[in-house]
Amino acid sequence: MTMELTPRERCERAVRFEDVDFVPLTIYERKIPQCEAERELRNDGLCIVQRGPGVFGVRRPNVLGSESHSFVDNGRRVTRTVTRTTAGELSTLVQPAGFTTWHHEKMFKGPDDYAALLAYASDVEVVPNYEPFMRMDELKGGDAVMRGAVGLEPMQLIVHHWMGVEVFAIEWMERRDEVLKLYEALVEERRKTYPVLAASPCEQFNYGGNVTPEIIGEARFREYYVPNYEECCEVLQPAGKLVGCHFDANTRVIADAIAETSLDYIEAFTPAPDTDMTLAEARAAWPDKALWINYPSSVWLRSDEAMEEVAVDLLKQAAPGNGLLIGVTEDVPDGRLYPGLNAINRAIHEHGRLPIA
């Protein structure tokens, strides 16, 4: 196959199962510094995944104000944010930690916070904000593929952002009705978001992710996650948009449920040895969904030769290669980024031209 594609065009075609010259290699915009080695990789096909700026804003009429202040506590630099709602105050305490953030206190601390959280999530207004996205899109040109975000799934936001797993488990058993009130309010907020996304200049959107099946389980996934994916797809897909989800954990338990969704692509799927499904199993389970995988994080600790061998094996597992993109969605050990990317790229250029035998 002879064609001249920019990195962006290659990704945009591959995720739609259209013909490409070779399997795309991508990396998040925050995972790679701009430098000579990065430029050489881009010249050789590496595509940057530009996640933002977003295409919408949110106005919360029940929020009266929010204040943040930073201080040192036991040698730690932390930030407390206090949000005042019409039904009470909510607060968080976070600690910046290099490339991540430690959440020492989440918004929900006990049953007394339900009223304030419900006020926070209710009567939300979603407003378009397309200009920043359009400017970034023009700046990036053919070097980056632009990706938008719907936001976390309503239940995922409650579990991981507002409560934390342990607290959620207790609340789910003790005060499920209160949890479901929050869930319904967030579902309504998402429903207001979908038309704004459909009318936006962005062509693809991730809807949440980081689902942990061992915690959520198949039944709750089907009841509280899948319907939201479907509602989103019903609005966005007729407008020509693609909808995917960041499934980077063990997905075997929910593989059948994922297969039944209308999602266009599975993003950050991390094959064995890091999770409980191989790439071949994922392709068999989800034949109609593009697989925008994360190159297994543990393999970055191996030699360049071993990384190249694993990349070749992944390409063969996904033969003939349509609808496959290899991405880097996690942090890479110090000193391994550029050697590893070059190893993967060599495998792609030597063994990843379509159709893969």
Regions found by a protein language model. Give the residues of each.
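Segments that shape or occlude catalytic/ligand-binding pockets
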Residues: 30-67, 71-72
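Short, surface-exposed loop and linker segments with low hydrophobicity and enrichment for Pro/Ser/Thr
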Residues: 10-21, 64-80
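Polar low-complexity intrinsically disordered regions enriched in Ser/Thr and small residues
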Residues: 48, 57-60, 68, 113, ...
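A contiguous, low-structure linker/loop signature
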Residues: 69-123, 142-145
